[in-house]
Amino acid sequence: MTDQEAAERFGARIDRLADRATSDCAAFEPPADPPDRDQALAYLREGAGPAISVYVEARTGGQMVHFPPERYHALEGAMNDWLTLYAACYGVDSQVSYTLREAAELLLDTANIADVAQILTGVPER
C-alpha cells in the first residue's frame, strides 16, 4: 500500500469516527440514575477504542502513516468526546483532553479500553 493509499484509507476511517462522535455527543442524554455502565462501555467499545486503534495501526506494522493536522485533531477530539461521554455516564461532568499517544500507550500496556478510560478519567474511582 502506498503512503497516499494508506492516508486515504485512514482518513476515511477518521472521518467516520469523528462524525459518529459528533452524533453521539448531540444525542447524549445524561442517565437519570447514574451510573449507566452499559452505555459507558458502549462509548468505549464503539468509539474511543476504535479511535485509539486507528492511531496504533497507523503507527505500527512497518508503515508510519502521517495524518494531516486536521485529521489528527479530528481523531483525537473524537476520542476525547467519547471519554467525556463515558465519564458523564457515571454522573461526572468533565471535559477531558488527552493525546492519542497517551491513550495508545495505556492501551498497549493494559490491553483493556475500560482500564484506559478509568486511568485517564479517574472514573469510576478505585
Predicted regions and their residues:
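Acidic, polar-rich N-terminal leader regions of halophilic archaeal proteins
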Residues: 1-126
